[in-house]
């Protein structure tokens, strides 16, 4: 996906600390860009709307939870 990321409004969870976390930006075509707030110079990961919705469904249902060791 070749997406223009200039001028995007990035945000993170209000529950996150100042130490850094994941930031997302909504894309005009409906997807999202995801980046690490500690290394904003790296190219963000870009997901279309369907990919992002599938991720959210999986995260909310516990599908992608790591096992407790």
At which residue positions do the language-model features occur?
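Positively charged, low-complexity terminal tracts
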Residues: 1-69
């Amino acid at each position: 996906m070749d997406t223009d990321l200039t001028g995007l409004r990035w945000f993170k969870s209000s529950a996150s600390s100042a130490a850094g976390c994941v930031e997302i930006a909504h894309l005009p075509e409906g997807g999202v860009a995801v980046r690490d707030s500690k290394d904003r110079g790296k190219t963000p990961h870009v997901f279309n709307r369907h990919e992002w919705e599938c991720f959210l469904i999986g995260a909310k249902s516990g599908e992608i939870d790591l096992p407790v060791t």
